[in-house]
UniProtKB/Swiss-Prot annotation:
F-type ATPases have 2 components, CF(1) - the catalytic core - and CF(0) - the membrane proton channel. CF(1) has five subunits: alpha(3), beta(3), gamma(1), delta(1), epsilon(1). CF(0) has four main subunits: a(1), b(1), b'(1) and c(9-12). Its EC number is 7.1.2.2. This is ATP synthase subunit beta, chloroplastic. It comes from Tupiella akineta (Green alga). The gene is atpB. Belongs to the ATPase alpha/beta chains family. The keyword ATP-binding applies. It catalyses: ATP + H2O + 4 H(+)(in) = ADP + phosphate + 5 H(+)(out). It comes from the Eukaryota. GO terms for cellular component: chloroplast thylakoid membrane; mitochondrion; proton-transporting ATP synthase complex. The lineage of its organism: Eukaryota, Viridiplantae, Chlorophyta, Ulvophyceae, OUU clade.
Length: 481
């Protein structure tokens, strides 16, 4: 965090410490504002240096405030000095953040040199006013066939990413980061909220390997990473999403770019808020969640939007506790989503990547008056064919293909081609697959699927459609088989 403490220091003293919650007393008339950052620097009884930053959450009366710590409170004692910085937590923003890993305070944690940032912004900011919003509905083309055709993303929208372990979430995220940089000249910000440290490290290593982060030329990197992992105090996990969002807002508002904001995992943001709420002594609401759940979620989500300057499109991994979609945490998240991308283990086990489930994934953008009649009818026909194939699978398993009618056999053959054509080679997976990545425009995607549906390509083998970009590549591949 960029800490320029005001010259006339407002110093209080710690009166109580309960885990990550700190109470502090200040002189009459000198109480810090809600959300102000407080800093404790001193030496503990073992003679070790301690430095803790916290954020004011409540004004208790009797010249006391209650704050939540952003770091571990080990070694703090009653009576220690606590300094009001006079402003909220402030983090570095701009091009210098690209290729780097930050914590909730905006401090680099990747072991590289300090960030020399001339620009910094507070993490608590108002959402853009309605007059500044770009309310035009526009598709955000990703270059990934299955997404653009069946569950298109909205520019400045929010997308939920559902999928268990090992079905290709990370690779899909990295491909989106790569494609937004190439096709839209945009950048990405990744907020790791309350997930495993190992996963954060793996993502960083894979990004370096695939060229999304370029160590030799950091400014050519396409992403900034902000981590507040599982082992961090709840205060840090609750605020790390806002730190990532603040960095993304700068790219949108000042650099006027299209930004992709990844939040992994939005459920952990709610979970951290619930822990903080209990620590602050608030009465719990349904299922033990915080009473302010909808307000906290709204405060974060309303800042993620398109303005006349640029857009922030957010992709949020959603963990569903005990697979219960009615749980207040996922239910509150769903209210904000424009599209869902569901990854399927069944498709992944068949080797079809990206393993996006074409029937489970949805989008509010898939309406004829938004995407146009041609796109809409093509998407509906693809879904219809795949659904019919799904219904016939039991019959095929028991009696075999020969027992189907001529019409149904055609449907099955086309559905299998569609299923394979929905796969495509990724740029970021080139190092693993050996196949060069492909960015497929929406126009080419629609043309390709229309030709499969009309039966023009019934004589081509289904293997020709596997892991190719456009239809021309499938035809060329068929000639070599």
């Amino acid at each position: 965090m960029v800490l320029s403490i005001q010259t006339n220091k407002n110093v209080g003293s710690i009166t109580q410490i309960i885990g990550p919650v700190i109470d502090a007393a200040f002189a009459p008339g000198q109480l810090p504002n809600i959300y102000n950052a407080l800093v404790i620097k001193g030496t503990n009884q073992a003679g070790q240096e301690v430095a803790v930053t916290c954020e004011v959450q409540q004004l208790l009366g009797d010249h006391c405030v209650r704050a939540v710590a952003m770091n571990a409170t080990d070694g703090l004692m009653r009576g220690m000095n606590i300094v009001d910085t006079g402003k909220p937590l402030t983090v570095p923003v701009g091009k210098v953040t690209l290729g780097r890993i930050f914590n909730v305070l905006g401090e680099p944690v990747d072991g590289l040199e300090a960030v020399d940032s001339k620009e910094s912004l507070p993490i608590h900011r108002k959402a853009p006013a309605f007059v500044d919003l770009d309310t035009k509905l526009a598709i955000f083309e990703t270059g990934i066939k299955v997404v653009d055709l069946l569950a298109p993303y909205r520019r400045g929208g929010k997308i939920g990413l559902f999928g268990g372990a090992g079905v290709g979430k990370t690779v899909l995220i990295m491909e989106l980061i790569n494609n937004i940089a190439k096709a839209h000249g945009g950048v990405s910000v990744f907020g790791g909220v309350g997930e495993r440290t190992r996963e954060g490290n793996d993502l960083y290593m894979e990004m370096k390997e695939s060229g999304v982060i370029q160590e030799k030329n950091m400014s050519a990197s396409k992403v900034a990473l902000v981590y507040g992992q599982m082992n961090e105090p709840p205060g840090a996990r609750m605020r790390v999403g806002l730190t990532a969002l603040t960095m993304a807002e700068y790219f949108r508002d000042i650099n006027k770019q299209d930004v992709l904001l990844f939040i992994d995992n939005i459920f952990r943001f709610v979970q951290a808020g619930s822990e903080v709420s209990a620590l602050l002594g608030r009465m719990p609401s349904a299922v033990g969640y915080q009473p302010t759940l909808a307000t906290e979620m709204g405060g974060l989500q309303e800042r993620i939007t398109s303005t006349k300057d640029g857009s922030i499109t957010s992709i949020q991994a959603v963990y569903v506790p005990a697979d219960d979609l009615t749980d207040p945490a996922p239910a509150t998240t769903f209210a904000h989503l424009d599209a869902t991308t569901v990854l399927s283990r069944g498709l992944a086990s068949k080797g079809i990547y990206p393993a996006v489930d074409p029937l489970d994934s949805t989008s509010t953008m898939l309406q004829p008056w938004i995407v146009g009649e041609e796109h809409y009818s093509c998407a509906q026909n693809v879904k219809e064919t795949l659904q019919r194939y799904k219904e016939l699978q039991d019959i095929i398993a028991i009696l075999g293909l020969d027992e189907l009618s001529e019409e149904d056999r055609k449907v099955v053959a086309r559905a299998r081609k569609i299923e394979r054509f929905l796969s495509q080679p990724f740029f970021v997976a080139e190092v693993f697959t050996g196949s060069p990545g492909k960015y497929v425009s929406l126009k080419e995607t629609i043309q390709g699927f229309n030709k499969i549906l009309t039966g023009e390509l019934d004589d081509l083998p289904e293997q020709a459609f596997y892991l190719v970009g456009t239809l021309d590549e499938a035809v060329a591949k068929a000639a070599t088989l």
